Amino acid sequence: MATGTFDIIHPGHITFLREAKKLGDELIVIVAREKNVRHKPKPVVPEEQRRRVVEAIKYVDKAILGDEDDMFRPIMELKPDVIVLGHDQHFDEDWLKEELRKRNLNCEVVRIRVKEDCPLCSSHKIIERILEKYGGR
């Protein structure tokens, strides 16, 4: 299982999902609800559209929207063997492991360290580039 906002898909997202897929037989991705994105600006792309795009990526078996009230609800329902975090995701691994343990979920938490190196491997950088090129028109 992997999670993320996945706003404006870029090569970094693809690398993350490819590496996550290597860790199990099936990759289910939880796409963050707009309401729950707090650590960065709200997504540009609507949540259902982000979910559909993520699900279309060949490494992803299924993409679902997260729960608006309890981020652990889909995890409790799906009971994954592994939860994969990206190199830049804002989760404290120890906190996440402890919260999973409290809920009697025995799943491994793995942080993917592989990072795609490209000029626009960030949704924020893509937005900045668009504004530079077209913002004044």
UniProtKB/Swiss-Prot annotation:
Q: Which CDD domains match?
A: cytidylyltransferase
UniProt-listed InterPro entries: Archaeal_FAD_synthase (IPR050385), Cyt_trans-like (IPR004821), FAD_synth_RibL (IPR024902), Rossmann-like_a/b/a_fold (IPR014729)
Q: Which residues bind ATP?
A: 5-6, 10-13, 88
Tell me where on the tree of life, at the top rank, the source sits.
Archaea
Q: List the disulfide bonds.
A: none
- Span-the-membrane segments of this chain are none
Q: Please write the reaction equations for the catalytic activity of this protein.
A: FMN + ATP + H(+) = FAD + diphosphate
Cofactors, names only: a divalent metal cation
Q: Which terms does the record give in the GO molecular function aspect? A: ATP binding; FMN adenylyltransferase activity
Q: What does this protein do?
A: Catalyzes the transfer of the AMP portion of ATP to flavin mononucleotide (FMN) to produce flavin adenine dinucleotide (FAD) coenzyme.
HAMAP family per record: FAD_synth_arch
Q: What is the protein named? A: FAD synthase
Record the organism: Archaeoglobus fulgidus (strain ATCC 49558 / DSM 4304 / JCM 9628 / NBRC 100126 / VC-16)
The taxonomic lineage of its organism, from the top, reads: Archaea, Methanobacteriati, Methanobacteriota, Archaeoglobi, Archaeoglobales
What gene name is given for the protein in this entry? ribL
